[in-house]
Amino acid sequence: MRKMAHLKLMNIYLYKRMLNVQRIVLLLLYVTFTVPSLAEVATMQLPQLSLNLNNVTRREVFNTIEKNTKYVFIYSDELLTELNEKVSIHVNKQTLDKILDKVLHLTSLGYKITNRQITVSKKAQTVIPKTPLKITGHVTDEKGEALIGVNIQEEGTNNVVITDMDGNFSIYNVSGPSSVLQFTYIGFVPLKIVVGKQTNMSVKLDPDIKGLEEVVVVGYGSQKRESVIGAITTMKPAALQVNQSRSVTNALAGQVAGVIAVQRSGEPGNDTSDFWIRGISSFGAGTTPLVLVDGIERSLSNISPEEIESFSVLKDATATAVYGVRGANGVILVQTKRGQIGKPRIQIKADYGFSAPTMLPEFVDGAKYMEVMNVASQFSSGKDMYTQAAIDATRNGTDPDLYPNVNWLKTITKDHVPNGRVSLDINGGTERLRYSMVLAYHGETGMTVTDPGVEYNTSNNLSRYNIRTNLDMNLTPSTEINVSLGGYIMNQRTPGFSTNAAPFTDIIYLAFKNTPIVHPTVYSNGQIPANTSQTNPWAAATHSGFISSYKSSLQSVFAVTQDIGKLWHPLKGLKAKATFSFDTYAWNSFLRRKTQTTYMATGRDEEGNLLTSITNQGDDYLQYAKEAGGNRTMYLEGQLSYSRLLADNHQIDGLLLYNMRDYVNADAASAIYSLPYRTQGIAARLSYSYKGRYFIEGNFGYNGSENFSKGNKWGFFPSVAGGWLVTNEKFMENALSVLSKLKFRGSYGLVGNDQLAGRRFAFLSTINSGNGFTYGLTGNQGIGGKFEGDFGVEDLSWETVKKTDIGVEIGLWDCVNIQADYFHEKREDIFMQRKTIPETAGFNTNPWANFGIVKNQGFDASLEVNKSFGKDFFLSLRGNFTFSRNEIVEYDESGDYETNNPCTYWKSIEHILRTESYRSVSGRGF
């Protein structure tokens, strides 16, 4: 019994072992016959799908498969370049592996299916000995013109060449007939060609129409031209480079619809133009537009035109509302040049020209002046002021020392002076690193004359050196870093006369003020003439010493952009960006002024020698003094942006942004103005378009200002806009050959202004020291003490502007573009000092208030023609028109001859006259 039991147990043990062996054999057979060796998929168990997808990325195909099956795709960011390429898939009830084979055809990618996961990765490189091939060819565009620098790469290898100056190429060591050559070129659709039996190729690349759509820089971002519904005008950089002036502002006049520019001086270094967008709509402070260079508030005066890549003018509320407090007067956006993918491109440019006075007034000569003065004297006293003998001596020039005849304006100015500009532009890069560097020099000479006999140089001249370097680096497929460094060094020399920043202006004033017969420029004995009441203009220009000024600026921007959608697909289209900027400006001046000893002729002695007397005892040597100053600005910005096209019809774009600016002025005249100027705000934008036909956009800016009390520091400035691109409608298809573009748009919004003229922290009162209260009739009975200086106004708040804009854009025959806008602005609560407060109120200085109202309306339009006549001739015409008229609706205006300052009676009284002359300038505009 025990033996039988033992045998029975052994049989059971052997039976179980045999079952295990059978299971292993069956498993091996199953794996052998059901799993393909190449794609590693279980074909018989894979689902079947029907797909009909046009021009979508491989990632979008994967998303569609995920939605219709239980499979999930896994891949790394390193594969995104090929996965973002677009394909078209049309299959009907095919298995998943067949679909994936088609999707990944002509790529270096393979896949592996494990349970419900599909892992996409690089194919293992299989080395198969083949006879290497040499492929030659020629690459042209759609017009048959050779393309230079086209990138040609054998797919999956590092075998790369580019086309030569004639569009020809030769690529060696091509693996074999199954190799694929990739042709890529900026602005053209990439092309892949299987080598096959070809050894010589003729390749034509088609322009990338989608990629070439014009992009317009807007507030805190960019938009495609067709989707812009704000009043935005762009200016080509080439138009800025025509003007030889130092300042870009001088090139704005007549170039941009809606921009009015006035240049008041041509003196080197002091020739910057004042400019306004759509006229002047306020009699308060802060009427100039906000200027942003690479997104940072900066001046246009010392940017070289060669640095600029794009120039946009934002005019209506929709375009400027995101700037809130700073956008009331419009915004100018300047983008400097960025690197482009391709081999290094080096451009050297040199300009040389001459400057001359455009128009000088014609003055009467000395004799005519004396005759006219005699006529005037006859009316007043009945006597002549000058004898006929003196008039004849002046006319004949027999004794210019005693009878001078001087045209002072011509005496102190040259007929023409040279100026020049040289620039070096280097641009290029790869997909990982793009670079741009611009070096520029600008030099010009002023119009004032010099005296070769003087041992020092009094010429008016300027030299400026600019540099701008921009780097864009893709650290990963989803992370980009932008670094921008720029600045300038400027040396300027002016005559030592005057403490004004623009001495030439004062010298010109002297030339207008002095009569032609007061004295000659210099006496025949070398002495410099001048009477006790007037300054010799020629001596002011040539013998007053000199001032040497050195100015420098360093500008920097650092930005990091993270494409969140590439890290997590459900957030496709979402990007985060952080920006930091630090700018510094410094200047110093060495003042080597000299007061010249001057004389005045009294006659001649018996021997004919000139007799003179000293009118002013001057210096024996050049004086020495120095001045210095500067400022610095820090800016911080963080933003989230979203852009997504849904179902091929619905385009949604959004922006949420926070910014902060800190500015310190080292030139402050008092302690209160030396404190940092700080602003911060939030901005947002949401836009939607349907099929590229209908557009709607909302913006707002929420800004804080230090100028107001606690309850009024923050202001909310919203806007809304809508547009209709008629030519994208189906019923317009037959008219597109003539009417290539027709778009209507309109906007309404609110923007703000917080600038006060000469009054910081206006909600706070100030305490001054002085004579205190006075009594009596003589005006000198003051008792020393403290008194209230500026009266603080707690409820001071924002100056607000309500803006309305209606515009139309018309394109004809794809070469004529017309843009026209009607605008209306109403500016309320304008900051001003009250004028009608009686003296009995007891204010030492009139308080500030939100009081004024100004309406401004008009229209601007531009016409642009760009027509090509064959390959060798191109016609470009541009014109614009701007009309603006404003009306002062409310102004706290004093009565005729009414005092403007409620102060003690012995102080000077200012009179305000209600005249049309003021309103013709500020009321009716330009």
Where are these regions (language model features)?
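Short, small/polar-rich motifs associated with maturation and membrane association
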Residues: 1-467, 481
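Extracellular/periplasmic, surface-exposed regions of secreted and cell-surface proteins
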Residues: 240-243, 287-288, 416, 420, ...
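Acidic, glycine-rich flexible loop segments
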Residues: 384-407, 421-423, 503-535
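Proline-centered flexible-loop/turn and helix-kink motifs
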Residues: 252, 257, 512-517, 648
